[in-house]
Structures are given as structure tokens and as C-alpha cells.
Amino acid sequence: MADDAHRREAFARLESALDRLPERERLAIHLHYLDPEPVHAAKRALGLSRSGYYKTLDRARTRLAAILDRETTS
């Protein structure tokens, strides 16, 4: 039971943090991790080149980590 509650809480924090990302970054995270798409399909959906897709994904991960870090330290 405690594990389930902890998982629900962690997922809620993640959803909240994802909602705070810019739309393109949120979609990149979604396509890459939550609804895995091949890179060619994900970059096409975002209208990006391959390098642009990976740069957007990197920015999204960095921003997401910072948001989650701020939430856990405040």
C-alpha cells in the first residue's frame, strides 16, 4: 500500500512538472518516453530535424529535472 501511494505521489509530481514545460518540449518527452515513437516519426510530428529533435529533448530533460529538483528541495 505504501509503495502504491508513493508511486501515485511521484507520478502526480511528474505530471505537474510536465505541465510546466513549453508545449514542444512536453510533446518531445511524451513521444520519446511515454508513447515511444521512432525518432523519424517524433521529429516529423514536431517539425524538427534530427538534431533539432535531440536538442529539444535535451532541453526538456534539463528543464524537467530542474523543476523536479526545485519541488523536492522547497
List PLM regions with ranges.
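Short alpha-helical "packing" element that flanks the helix-turn-helix/winged-helix DNA-binding module
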Residues: 14, 28-29
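C-terminal edge and immediately downstream basic/flexible tail or linker adjoining helix-turn-helix-like DNA-binding
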Residues: 45, 58-74
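Major-groove recognition helix of helix-turn-helix-like DNA-binding domains
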Residues: 52-58
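Acidic, proline/glycine-rich intrinsically disordered inter-domain spacer in sigma factors
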Residues: 1-16
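Helix-turn-helix DNA-binding module
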Residues: 19, 23-27, 35-52
